[in-house]
């Protein structure tokens, strides 16, 4: 049985491939666009059966000529995730139409289809629950994800031939994101700031939040891969699900976890947030004027629906997840 993973050389895709490998599954077709060649490193530690360029894959899907038999599932992680890319033509073709073509093909062939949606569909909302009235995307990236989620909702009412699951990822961090540049997680950037400068910067107070007190639902990519595989194991489940921890934690906590993990590797003792600030290992910079009124100061996934679907595993909190991530970066990137 063959499994297809799109975006397989990317951040989440490569972690799904790795998680499948840990189950002994290697009959995997990895689909990606390696024009950014350094992404190959994410697959170098994985076992796959074949690599297929994204454009050739799309052509074969659209012409219904993919040569693989007994495809067990498609994990669709291939998309433009740059929220600052405002090229609507590219975004809608790459994120919406590509995903729609894959959905149609999977439904025709009765193949389970698990795809990456995004918490960006909620825009600046304060309630993050999988309900249409709460969804107000602020950019074309969020809209591309939102629009496809609406397609799934309509298809579910009409009746599906095979499982379809969309995961609304919140703030994902973890190994294999180094190719993402400015779009990499805050944990990644804090690690490199601390290693280069000996301190990390956080935004100061804004919008009623104190220094570094803005919060996010930070979720480890290890947990993201686990949830994907849980639904792979349960093909009777379809729908749209938030994929976060259900906790909202401060950037202060993330910065402290990163700095303390780096300090531990240096044989230095853990310090409290107060001590880290006093020693200027965490510093605050004025909140940028350009972001005022546009910045989301709070996110927290409502994971009620995920729990109701039977997923019972506990998620890493920031301290434990970042500690694991920093150890990986010290071994692989430092």
Swiss-Prot record:
<feature type="binding site">
    <location>
        <position position="295"/>
    </location>
    <ligand>
        <name>substrate</name>
    </ligand>
</feature>
<dbReference type="GO" id="GO:0050661">
    <property type="term" value="F:NADP binding"/>
</dbReference>
<feature type="binding site">
    <location>
        <begin position="77"/>
        <end position="81"/>
    </location>
    <ligand>
        <name>NADP(+)</name>
    </ligand>
</feature>
<feature type="binding site">
    <location>
        <position position="180"/>
    </location>
    <ligand>
        <name>NADP(+)</name>
    </ligand>
</feature>
<comment type="function">
    <text>Catalyzes the interconversion between ADP-D-glycero-beta-D-manno-heptose and ADP-L-glycero-beta-D-manno-heptose via an epimerization at carbon 6 of the heptose.</text>
</comment>
<feature type="binding site">
    <location>
        <position position="172"/>
    </location>
    <ligand>
        <name>NADP(+)</name>
    </ligand>
</feature>
<feature type="binding site">
    <location>
        <position position="182"/>
    </location>
    <ligand>
        <name>substrate</name>
    </ligand>
</feature>
<feature type="binding site">
    <location>
        <position position="39"/>
    </location>
    <ligand>
        <name>NADP(+)</name>
    </ligand>
</feature>
<feature type="binding site">
    <location>
        <position position="216"/>
    </location>
    <ligand>
        <name>substrate</name>
    </ligand>
</feature>
<feature type="binding site">
    <location>
        <position position="94"/>
    </location>
    <ligand>
        <name>NADP(+)</name>
    </ligand>
</feature>
<dbReference type="GO" id="GO:0008712">
    <property type="term" value="F:ADP-glyceromanno-heptose 6-epimerase activity"/>
</dbReference>
<protein>
    <recommendedName>
        <fullName>ADP-L-glycero-D-manno-heptose-6-epimerase</fullName>
        <ecNumber>5.1.3.20</ecNumber>
    </recommendedName>
</protein>
<comment type="subunit">
    <text>Homopentamer.</text>
</comment>
<feature type="binding site">
    <location>
        <position position="189"/>
    </location>
    <ligand>
        <name>substrate</name>
    </ligand>
</feature>
<dbReference type="GO" id="GO:0005975">
    <property type="term" value="P:carbohydrate metabolic process"/>
</dbReference>
<feature type="active site" description="Proton acceptor">
    <location>
        <position position="180"/>
    </location>
</feature>
<feature type="binding site">
    <location>
        <begin position="11"/>
        <end position="12"/>
    </location>
    <ligand>
        <name>NADP(+)</name>
    </ligand>
</feature>
<keyword id="KW-0413">Isomerase</keyword>
<dbReference type="InterPro" id="IPR036291">
    <property type="entry name" value="NAD(P)-bd_dom_sf"/>
</dbReference>
<comment type="pathway">
    <text>Nucleotide-sugar biosynthesis; ADP-L-glycero-beta-D-manno-heptose biosynthesis; ADP-L-glycero-beta-D-manno-heptose from D-glycero-beta-D-manno-heptose 7-phosphate: step 4/4.</text>
</comment>
<keyword id="KW-0119">Carbohydrate metabolism</keyword>
<dbReference type="Pfam" id="PF01370">
    <property type="entry name" value="Epimerase"/>
</dbReference>
<comment type="pathway">
    <text>Bacterial outer membrane biogenesis; LOS core biosynthesis.</text>
</comment>
<feature type="binding site">
    <location>
        <position position="54"/>
    </location>
    <ligand>
        <name>NADP(+)</name>
    </ligand>
</feature>
<keyword id="KW-0521">NADP</keyword>
<dbReference type="GO" id="GO:0097171">
    <property type="term" value="P:ADP-L-glycero-beta-D-manno-heptose biosynthetic process"/>
</dbReference>
<dbReference type="InterPro" id="IPR011912">
    <property type="entry name" value="Heptose_epim"/>
</dbReference>
<dbReference type="InterPro" id="IPR001509">
    <property type="entry name" value="Epimerase_deHydtase"/>
</dbReference>
<feature type="active site" description="Proton acceptor">
    <location>
        <position position="141"/>
    </location>
</feature>
<feature type="binding site">
    <location>
        <begin position="203"/>
        <end position="206"/>
    </location>
    <ligand>
        <name>substrate</name>
    </ligand>
</feature>
<feature type="binding site">
    <location>
        <position position="145"/>
    </location>
    <ligand>
        <name>NADP(+)</name>
    </ligand>
</feature>
<feature type="binding site">
    <location>
        <position position="171"/>
    </location>
    <ligand>
        <name>substrate</name>
    </ligand>
</feature>
<feature type="binding site">
    <location>
        <begin position="32"/>
        <end position="33"/>
    </location>
    <ligand>
        <name>NADP(+)</name>
    </ligand>
</feature>
<comment type="similarity">
    <text>Belongs to the NAD(P)-dependent epimerase/dehydratase family. HldD subfamily.</text>
</comment>
């Amino acid at each position: 049985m063959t499994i297809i993973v799109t975006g397989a050389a990317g951040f989440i895709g490569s972690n799904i491939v790795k998680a499948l490998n840990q189950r002994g599954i290697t009959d995997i077709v990895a689909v990606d666009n390696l024009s950014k060649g350094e992404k190959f490193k994410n697959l170098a530690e994985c076992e796959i059966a074949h690599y297929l360029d994204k454009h050739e894959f799309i052509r074969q899907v659209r012409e219904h000529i993919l040569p693989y038999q007994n495809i067990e599932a498609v994990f669709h992680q291939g998309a433009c995730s740059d929220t600052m890319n405002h090229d609507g033509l590219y975004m809608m073709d790459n994120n919406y139409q590509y995903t729609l073509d894959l959905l149609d093909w999977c439904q025709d062939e009765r193949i389970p289809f698990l795809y990456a949606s995004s918490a960006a569909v909620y825009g600046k909302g304060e309630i993050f629950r999988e309900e249409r009235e709460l969804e107000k995307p602020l950019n074309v990236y969020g809209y591309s994800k939102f629009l496809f989620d609406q397609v799934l909702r309509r298809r579910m009412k009409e009746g599906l031939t095979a499982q379809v699951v969309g995961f609304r990822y919140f703030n994902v961090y973890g190994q294999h994101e180094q190719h993402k540049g400015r779009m990499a997680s805050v944990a990644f950037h804090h690690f490199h700031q601390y290693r280069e400068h000996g301190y990390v910067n956080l935004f100061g107070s804004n919008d009623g939040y104190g220094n570094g007190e803005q919060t996010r639902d930070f979720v480890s990519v290890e947990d993201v891969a686990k949830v994907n595989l849980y639904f792979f194991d349960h093909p009777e489940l379809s729908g749209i699900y938030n994929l976060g921890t259900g906790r909202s934690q401060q950037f202060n906590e993330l910065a402290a976890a990163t700095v303390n993990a780096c300090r531990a590797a240096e044989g230095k003792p853990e310090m409290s947030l107060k001590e880290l600030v006093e020693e200027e290992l965490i510093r605050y910079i004025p909140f940028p004027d350009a972001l005022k009124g546009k910045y989301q100061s709070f996110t927290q996934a409502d994971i009620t629906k995920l729990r109701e679907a039977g997923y019972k595993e506990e998620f890493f909190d920031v301290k434990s997840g970042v500690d694991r991530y920093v150890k990986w970066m010290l071994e692989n990137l430092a």
